[in-house]
Amino acid sequence: EHPALYRRYSKEHTFCKTKNQXCN
């Protein structure tokens, strides 16, 4: 895996959850 990409995905996923949006 690519830690950088995974970290970025995790951050964006958390951001979507914070905004009550779904992440596709």
From Swiss-Prot:
The keyword Membrane does not apply. Its EC number is 3.2.1.35. Expressed by the venom gland. The keyword Secreted applies. Keywords: Hydrolase, Secreted. It catalyses: Random hydrolysis of (1->4)-linkages between N-acetyl-beta-D-glucosamine and D-glucuronate residues in hyaluronate. Possesses high activity against hyaluronan in vitro. This is Hyaluronidase. It comes from Tityus stigmurus (Brazilian scorpion).
